[in-house]
C-alpha cells in the first residue's frame, strides 16, 4: 500500500540553505578519524611498508589514548588510501610523510531522501518523452538491461521483493556485525527505480546491493570511510568479474566534499566504471559535496512533474543532468515483499539515470564510461527546466531517445 513515509534523515540537509555548506558540514566531522590518500604510483610494497610505519608511530605515541590506528585500507588501480583513528602526534607524523598526497577528516554522510505523500509513477514517462506530464513509459525492449549490473551503494535490499524477480543479490556489507537486510527501505526504493519490473528503467538488470548504512543508527547516517569501503568493494568486484562495460555504480547519498572519495571515483572512471551520484538535498552548490563533486561522476539533480527544479535539489555546474525526484513511486520494504511507496529527493532522481546508463549500455553496447556519459548528455532534453535562474546549472533532463 502506498502511504506517507518519513525518511528525512538529517534536517540540516533538507532545509533551504541559509548558510554556506562549509558551515553546515562543520559539525559533521567524525572526531579523531581521518582518511589518508597516498601519492599516485605507490607500489604494493611501498604501501605495505607505509602502513607498517604508521602502525609503529601510532603504537609509540604517548597520547594515542582511545585512538585505534589504521582501520580500513583502500587499494584500487590509481587510488591508494587508508582510514583510521589517530591522535594529533601520529597525525602530524603522517602529514609529514613524503608518500602522502593529502589528509582529510572523515565525515558524516546522509541519504538524500525527503518525505512525500502518495502519487503516480511519472518518472518513467519523463525519461521517455520530451514533454512533461506523461505517464507512459516508452522503451526499446532490447534495452532492458539483461546481463547488466547495478551496484547500489545504499541501505541494503529486499531481495525477495516481487519487483526484482530474483535478480537481486547481497554483495557486500560494510557493517559485518549487523544483519545484511534493508530495514530502512531507501536501498530497495532506489533499486526498484533502476531495475524493478514495474518501476524500473532497465527492467531486466541484475542488482548487487552494497550496504553502507546501519539500521542501528537513529539518524541513519554513515561516514566517508565506510562508504568508501563499500565503493572500493564494488569497483574490485566489477573488475574481477570483467563487468566494466556492463555495470554502473549508483550512489543516492553523500556528505561534505572529500578529495579522497572523488579520487576513488576518478580511478574507477579511468577503469571504465561509471558512477552516478545524487546532487544532494541542501538547495546549495553541489560542488561542496561528494560524490556529487567528482568530476567524472554523472551528477543528478531533481525536477518535479512539471520540469521545475525541486526546491531541495542541489545545483551548479557540477550537476550534469536532471531527472524525476519528486513523488517517485517505487518498491518498498514490508512483510509481503510487495510493498511500494512514494518518496522525494535527489536519491530518487539518481536511479532514473543509473537505469538509463544500463538501458543504453545494453541497447547500444557502450564499452567505456566516457562514451555512455557523452550519450546521455547528447540525448538529454535541453532548455525545458525552470527554476534554474542564478544556479549556473545545465538545463538538461535525462531522456532515453525513443520518442520525438
From Swiss-Prot:
Its EC number is 3.4.21.-. It holds the Pfam family Peptidase_S8. InterPro entries: PCSK9_ProteinaseK-like, Peptidase_S8/S53_dom, Peptidase_S8/S53_dom_sf, Peptidase_S8_Asp-AS, Peptidase_S8_His-AS, Peptidase_S8_Ser-AS, Peptidase_S8_subtilisin-like, Peptidase_S8_subtilisin-rel. One of its GO terms (molecular function) is serine-type endopeptidase activity. One of its GO terms (biological process) is proteolysis. The active site is at residues 154, 186, 347. Glycans are attached at residue 133. Residues 33-111 form the Inhibitor I9 domain. The keyword Signal applies. Belongs to the peptidase S8 family. This is Subtilisin-like proteinase Mp1.
Amino acid at each position: 500500500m502506498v502511504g506517507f513515509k518519513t525518511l528525512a534523515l538529517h534536517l540540516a540537509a533538507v532545509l533551504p540553505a541559509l548558510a554556506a555548506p562549509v558551515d553546515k558540514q562543520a559539525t559533521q566531522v567524525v572526531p579523531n578519524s581521518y582518511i589518508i590518500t597516498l601519492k599516485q604510483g605507490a607500489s604494493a610494497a611501498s604501501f605495505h611498508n607505509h602502513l607498517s610505519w604508521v602502525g609503529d608511530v601510532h603504537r609509540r605515541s604517548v597520547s594515542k589514548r582511545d585512538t585505534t590506528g589504521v582501520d580500513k585500507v583502500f587499494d584500487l588501480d590509481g587510488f591508494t588510501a587508508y582510514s583510521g583513528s589517530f591522535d594529533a602526534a601520529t597525525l602530524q607524523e603522517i602529514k609529514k610523510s613524503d608518500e602522502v598526497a593529502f589528509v582529510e577528516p572523515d565525515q558524516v554522510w546522509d541519504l538524500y531522501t525527503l518525505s512525500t505523500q502518495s502519487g503516480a509513477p511519472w518518472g518513467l514517462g519523463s525519461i521517455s518523452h520530451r514533454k512533461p506530464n506523461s505517464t507512459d513509459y516508452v522503451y526499446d525492449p532490447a534495452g532492458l538491461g539483461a546481463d547488466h549490473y547495478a551496484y547500489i551503494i545504499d541501505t541494503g535490499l529486499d531481495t525477495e521483493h516481487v519487483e526484482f524477480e530474483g535478480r537481486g543479490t547481497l554483495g557486500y556489507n560494510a557493517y559485518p556485525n549487523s544483519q545484511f537486510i534493508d530495514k530502512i527501505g531507501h536501498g530497495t526504493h532506489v533499486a526498484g527505480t533502476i531495475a524493478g519490473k514495474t518501476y524500473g528503467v532497465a527492467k531486466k538488470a541484475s542488482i548487487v546491493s552494497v550496504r553502507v548504512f546501519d539500521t542501528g543508527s537513529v539518524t541513519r547516517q554513515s561516514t566517508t570511510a565506510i562508504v568508501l569501503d563499500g565503493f572500493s568493494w564494488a569497483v574490485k568486484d566489477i573488475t574481477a568479474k570483467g563487468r566494466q562495460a556492463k555495470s554502473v555504480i549508483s550512489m543516492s547519498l553523500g556528505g561534505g566534499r572529500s578529495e579522497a572519495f572523488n579520487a576513488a571515483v576518478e580511478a574507477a572512471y579511468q577503469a571504465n566504471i561509471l558512477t552516478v551520484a545524487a546532487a544532494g538535498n541542501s538547495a546549495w552548490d553541489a560542488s561542496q559535496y561528494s560524490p556529487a563533486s567528482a568530476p567524472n561522476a554523472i551528477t543528478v539533480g531533481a525536477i518535479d512533474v512539471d520540469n521545475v527544479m525541486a526546491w531541495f535539489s542541489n545545483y551548479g555546474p557540477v550537476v550534469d543532468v536532471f531527472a524525476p525526484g519528486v513523488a517517485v513511486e517505487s518498491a518498498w520494504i514490508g512483510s509481503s515483499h510487495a510493498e511500494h511507496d512514494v518518496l522525494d529527493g535527489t536519491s530518487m532522481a539518481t536511479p532514473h539515470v543509473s537505469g538509463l546508463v544500463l538501458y543504453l549500455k545494453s541497447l547500444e553496447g557502450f564499452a567505456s564510461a566516457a562514451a555512455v556519459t557523452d550519450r546521455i548528455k547528447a540525448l538529454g532534453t535541453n532548455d525545458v527546466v525552470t527554476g534554474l535562474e542564478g544556479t549556473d546549472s545545465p538545463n538538461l533532463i535525462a531522456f532515453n531517445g525513443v520518442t520525438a
